[in-house]
UniProtKB/Swiss-Prot annotation:
Keywords, alphabetical: Cleavage on pair of basic residues, Disulfide bond, Ion channel impairing toxin, Nematocyst, Neurotoxin, Secreted, Signal, Toxin, Voltage-gated sodium channel impairing toxin
Organism lineage string: Eukaryota, Metazoa, Cnidaria, Anthozoa, Hexacorallia
Pfam families recorded: Toxin_4
Organism: Stichodactyla gigantea
Record GO terms (molecular function): sodium channel regulator activity; toxin activity
Predominant subcellular localization, coarse grouping: secreted
Subcellular location per the Swiss-Prot or TrEMBL entry: Secreted; Nematocyst
Proregion residues excised on maturation: 20-33, 84
Protein name as catalogued: Delta-stichotoxin-Sgt3a
Length: 84
């Protein structure tokens, strides 16, 4: 009898969790910004007055982009398209 109760409770939990899941469209509407602006080395000394010309890329810079900041992070790089 105890096993039957455990099975019923487990089934109820599975139904409750699956009913609360968001549909795929709602998942796509909740998006996280994948890129943000960052300060390249030649943007100026002050972060408040500098124009942020770089873009934060997770991992490393995309193909055709260059790393524009001298500092090193494991998770992301400050990158921009080559000038010219």
């Amino acid at each position: 009898m105890a096993y039957l109760k455990i099975v019923l409770v487990a089934l109820m939990l599975v139904v409750a969790v699956s009913a609360m899941r968001l549909s795929d469209q709602e998942d796509q509407d909740i998006s996280v910004a994948k890129r943000a602006a960052c300060k390249c080395d030649d943007d100026g000394p002050d972060i408040r007055s500098a124009t942020l010309t770089g873009t934060v890329d997770l991992g490393s810079c995309n193909e055709g982009w260059e790393k524009c900041a001298s500092f090193y992070t494991i998770l992301a790089d400050c990158c921009r398209r080559p000038r010219g």
